[in-house]
Amino acid sequence: MKFIYALILCLAALAVPAFAQEKPADTNMQILLDKVKADKKLVVAANMDLTEPEGKTFWPIYDEYQKELQSINDRLVKMILAYADVYNKNALTDAGAKQLTNEALAIDRDELRLRNIYTARIERFLPAKKVARYLQIENKIRAAIRYELATGIPLVP
């Protein structure tokens, strides 16, 4: 469980400084992202109790899912940075707010679509209880990260 908290703090640290500085240190951010990905996989592994045959089928699917999820995460970071830019300049227009809202909703839709696709794939190889457990782990991690991000991102003025 300590891994989850460390993971959350690391991810939250990535987005929130955007409201305080002009340019993030890309190298440091990439190192942090790589560490977070590795720690997340450790959290999942420690909590799934997979047999060897289950692991052989689960982990390749997990890795594919995380790779596709990364593109959604990249969009989320891009959206947060765009908001940070206009927020810091006090330049958010109604049109800009609508664009941010539409992108946020599209990100949520795409994440749900991806989760449904990969849940169906995992269900072919794991018992339903383990599928549910994995979804709980994934959802708790993502919810905690979103919460931490939300606490650091100011409301639209």
Q: How does the language model describe each region?
A:
Residues 21-27:
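Charged, compositionally biased N-terminal leader segments and the immediate start
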Residues 2, 78-80, 137-142:
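N-terminal hydrophobic signal/anchor transmembrane helix of membrane proteins
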Residues 16-20:
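Sec/Tat signal peptide C-region and signal peptidase I cleavage site
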Residues 1-4, 21:
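Positively charged n-region of N-terminal signal peptides that target proteins for export
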Residues 29-30, 43-125:
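Amphipathic alpha-helical segments
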Residues 5-15:
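Bacterial N-terminal signal peptides
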Residues 28-31, 35, 112-157:
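Amphipathic, charged alpha-helical segments and their helix-to-coil junctions
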Residues 38:
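Active-site-adjacent substrate/metal-binding segments within catalytic domains
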